[in-house]
Amino acid sequence: NFENPNFKLVSINVSRFDANKHMAESVVGDAKVSLLDISNALGNWKAPDDWYKKSREALNSWNNYLDKESGPTNQKLPSYAHVAGAIYRKSDPSDIAVTAAGGLVGEVLQVWRPRELNTHETEWGFSCMSYEISGALGIKMANPKKEVIAFVGDGSYLLYNSDIYSSVITNHKLIIVVCDNGGHAVINRLQLYKGGKEFNCLFESSKVDNLKNIDFAKHAESLGATGENVSSVSDLEAAFVRAKKSKSTYVISIK
């Protein structure tokens, strides 16, 4: 599209500063109101019929790609996409996915294709580490009859996890999936990709003398939740089914 000389991009944002994008016509305002105004301004104009057909074909191709990349796998260490895919396949349309920060955000955002409104919450603007569990608790309080699933890396989990206890004692059940990759892996990757050296992001390469492995399932149990460690995508799917049946907060950890 950017190669098309007639291509026009419209950028809508409530902030005048953020509405300014390269090669875009800036519109400052609420997205819903602005779209209605733009639609009214267009009158009877509509995109060619083959444009809709093209968009559906592209969407189907994208969904097929996602299903393939996030599908069942026997590889020793599953990817974030595999983890998100396993939970998505076993979830119900009303289940709400919550994530923030790290590599999980990008993968969950792509794999979790909402089947109902308001079933995907991502804190991405500030990559707010540890929003996952506390945010999930707030969402559960607002949606007590729905399953709320928090996807969280071990780094964010270690920074803030006490709302597991809060969820238990207030009877606001959460399902928490902990992806244990041994530290702040995305920041470590950024350091390396920018030409730097590892610096205290992955635990095993940090300057420590007494490194200990953490049993996140046992830690969750100490806060009153049910905890379970799994080692494969198929085990994760089975654990998630058990978590769905549980009456209280359930934490599943996978490396």
Task: Outline where the language-model segments fall.
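Non-catalytic alpha-helical coupling and interface elements of nucleotide-dependent molecular machines
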Residues: N40-N44, D92, S248
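Short coil/turn segments at secondary-structure boundaries
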Residues: D50-K54, A100-A101, S253-I254
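Glycine-rich, acidic loop regions that bind phosphate or pyrophosphate groups
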Residues: N1-K54
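Domain-wide signal for the mature, well-folded portions of proteins, strongly enriched
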Residues: P48-K54, Y88, W112, N210
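Active-site diphosphate/adenylate-binding microenvironment
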Residues: L59-S134, I139-K140, K145
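Thiamine diphosphate
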Residues: E3, A19-N20, S26-V28, K32-I38, ...
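A diffuse structural propensity rather than consistent per-protein peaks
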Residues: K46-P48, S79, D215, S232
